Amino acid sequence: MIPNRKIQLSLFAVIIVFETLLNQVYAMELDEATRTVTLEESGKTITLTPEQVKRGKRLFNNSCAQCHNGGITKTNPNIGLDPESLSGATPVRDNIRNLIEYIKDPTSYDGATSIAELHPSIKSAEIFPKMRNLTDEDLFAIAGHILIQPKIAAEKWGGGKIYY
């Protein structure tokens, strides 16, 4: 039984190393154009570093993907994280600054009602513990991840259950 255990542990270690290398390659492969996203409503842009890209992916997967895997919204399939949905919201959520504000204190799609008690956020960190330790830098990386995904996954990002 012990040799099998060693084989299992070795295989697990190889998978972890492969996953780590794959994530590093993923972030490095993205050119500047892909890593450039809108910073604020004025249209000002910013180019994310490979480290921010990698960090955003990890944090999104840990804190957001349970409900937003692939850019969908499991609780409301009509509103996803695709560019069209983000730009149609009030205020628009198609830039880093506004996405950060939304993650801190989410509102309904029309911006009229707080949904902090229903949607994980910094404001509702007591209810949603995964949000508890996220810093502004973490939120910046998560917002960046959301905004570069349409450039990487194209129509699959926010495309709904036909893809996921």
Swiss-Prot record:
Record membrane topology: Peripheral membrane protein
HAMAP family to which the protein is assigned, alphabetical: PSII_Cyt550 (MF_01378)
Secretion signal, residue range per the UniProt entry: 1-27
Protein name: Photosystem II extrinsic protein V
Organism: Gracilaria tenuistipitata var. liui
Keyword Heme assigned: yes
GO cellular component: chloroplast thylakoid membrane; photosystem II
UniProt: heme c binding residues: C64, C67, H68, M131
Main localisation: plastid
Subunit structure comment from the entry: PSII is composed of 1 copy each of membrane proteins PsbA, PsbB, PsbC, PsbD, PsbE, PsbF, PsbH, PsbI, PsbJ, PsbK, PsbL, PsbM, PsbT, PsbY, PsbZ, Psb30/Ycf12, at least 3 peripheral proteins of the oxygen-evolving complex and a large number of cofactors. It forms dimeric complexes. The extrinsic subunits in red algae are PsbO (OEC33), PsbQ', cytochrome c-550 and PsbU.
